[in-house]
Amino acid sequence: MLVGGNSQARDLANTLLEGDYLANRNFAYSEKLGACDTTDLASLPEAALFRSADLILITIHVPGPDCTGAKLEQLRRLTKADIIFVGPKNFGWNMNPLGRVAMADRGKTLVDALPFITQRNDLMARKLPRGTYLDLMRLLGPDGRRLPAFDAGGNPLSQDREHFTKYGAVFASKPVADEIERLRR
């Protein structure tokens, strides 16, 4: 399995590690596999990884479907792997007020994602071919616009609005792993 992208990809890999999804898999990471990177993948030293992978996960933060679609076509020419683009997660503008949420209320506290993130996410979900997009906003939240701010124990899921804490990775690990397997069928 190969995970590609920026810090979002490293966050995804950590999420999969927390849930033991990677326990019996060969795993590699490449930052050269960004959703909108225009590098010719076949010319990279990592090309053998792309060819030998059975699953490629590429994280998307803000890019649109045009460059992502081009990346999908480039990869399809290079590999037989299942290719899944993993959409963004976003915990709003400002995490600071969440520190004042009472422990008893944390498990039901939701935060609004930034509108431009949800708009891009919706566009990607509509434009990418079926089975190639993992919509984190809809998977982890109730409506594609909001995400839980805390786990059931009141622990914060993000410290910086865009990446998971360890608690966030544990919270998301099973749903993300299950969705990857569902998309691969």
Indicate where each model-derived feature is located:
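Extracellular glycan-modifying ectodomains
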Residues: M1-R185
